[in-house]
């Protein structure tokens, strides 16, 4: 018997005017997720999904390319204004933020939501190069 043709599921176009951009910049990668006010994901991208591998993922340029990609996806849903939440110590924080502003979004607020331990887990060993 012939296989049933697999259906390609299209993203339905939502009309959301404003949202929250979560920029998570680690030492190895930068992920950017755009959500609505309730926290439902609308679009996401990362340096890894944009084709960067290894140490190139942690560069500011990779974060910029990922931010341009996610902004294109979010603007298809009619998004115009963003609140930006930046987390992590990585080098892609500022460049991702600049790329979001350059893509035509109105950034209403920028918050640093990096978690800081109150002397929690023991850190990993010192790196000797």
Curated annotation (Swiss-Prot):
Molecular function in Gene Ontology: rRNA binding; structural constituent of ribosome
This protein's record includes keyword 4Fe-4S: no
Annotated GO biological process: translation
Gene3D superfamilies linked: Ribosomal protein S11
GO CC annotation, single: ribosome
Signal peptide range in chain numbering: none
Keyword Zinc: no
A Pfam family that the UniProt record links to this protein: Ribosomal_S11
Sorted UniProt keywords: Ribonucleoprotein, Ribosomal protein, RNA-binding, rRNA-binding
Reported function: Located on the platform of the 30S subunit, it bridges several disparate RNA helices of the 16S rRNA. Forms part of the Shine-Dalgarno cleft in the 70S ribosome.
Database matches in PANTHER family: 40S RIBOSOMAL PROTEIN S14/30S RIBOSOMAL PROTEIN S11
UniProt record similarity statement: Belongs to the universal ribosomal protein uS11 family.
NCBIfam families the UniProt entry points to: PRK05309.1, uS11_bact
Subunit-structure text: Part of the 30S ribosomal subunit. Interacts with proteins S7 and S18. Binds to IF-3.
Protein name listed in UniProt: Small ribosomal subunit protein uS11
Species annotation: Bradyrhizobium sp. (strain BTAi1 / ATCC BAA-1182)
Classification of source organism: Bacteria, Pseudomonadati, Pseudomonadota, Alphaproteobacteria, Hyphomicrobiales
Gene name of this polypeptide: rpsK
